[in-house]
Amino acid sequence: KITLQDNVTFSSGRAMDAEAVKQCLEHLLANHDRAAADTKIDSMEADGQVLTIHTSEPKPALLNYLGDPYGCIIDVDAGFDDGIVAGTGPYIATDCQSGDHLTLVKNENYWNGTPHIDELTIKTITDGNTLANALLSGEVQAAYGMAYESYPMFENDNFTFSQISTSRCFFLKMNFNEGSVCTDPAVRKAIAMGIDKEGFVENLLEGNGYPANGTFPAGSAFGGDKV
C-alpha cells in the first residue's frame, strides 16, 4: 500500500489522488514493456489517497522501480500529444520543441513551497564544444553532462562545479552459462583483481569518478560498509 501526500494537485488542476496515480500507472504498463517487466504489477486498487498494488511475484524493489524516470506520475487525462505533460513538480512546461528546447514557468500552486526562479529554458546541445562555448559566453547559465576535456576551462572562480556520486557505473558482465570458465569463483576473483580501477578512473575518466566496489556509491543507503 502506498499512501499519497494530501493536497497535491497536477498543473492541470486535477487532484493527485490514488485513482489518478492508478490511471497513470495503468497507461505506463500498457505502453512500456520494461516497466511492465520490472514491476510485475498484476492489479491495483484506489481508495482516496491510498493505492494498493498487487504484483504477480514478490517485488521488494517495487518502490525503486517506480522511482525510475519511466515512473513519473502525470495527469493522463490532460494529454501529452504536444510533448507537454501535467505533473506535480515546481515547474510547468509551456513549450516543448523536441531536440531544441523546453520552456518551464514556476508552478504557483506547487505543494512544497514557492520556486525561486520564475522561468527556465532548457536547451538541447549535443555537441560538447558548442555546450562549453555556450557556457563560457553566457548564452546558458548552467550545463549538465559537460565533456571531461572541457573541465579545465571552467576551473576558476567564475564557475562552480556540482558533483555527486551515483549508481551509474562501468561494469563487466561475466558468462555464467554451463561450460564457461567464469563459473569458477577463482577465475572471477582473478579477473576482478586484474582490473586497474584506479587507473581507469584517472586516465579514461580523467579523475572524474571513483573506484567502485559495488553497484551503489559508498554514501548511499546500500553502499560501502552498509552491505
What are these regions (language model features)?
Residues K1-H32, V181-T183:
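Aromatic- and charge-enriched surface segment that lines or borders ligand/interaction sites
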Residues T3, A35-D77, Q97:
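Surface-exposed binding/hinge segments that line
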Residues D38-T39, P152-Q163:
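Ligand-binding "clamshell"
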Residues P211-V227:
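Structural transition elements
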Residues D17-Q23, Q49-V50, P90, I117-E119, ...:
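Alpha-helical secondary-structure segments
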Residues T160-N175, G219-S220:
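Periplasmic-binding protein-like
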Residues A61-P115, E119, N129:
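Gly/Pro-rich hinge or "lid" segments in bacterial periplasmic/extracellular proteins
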Residues N109-M153:
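Ligand-site clamp/hinge motif
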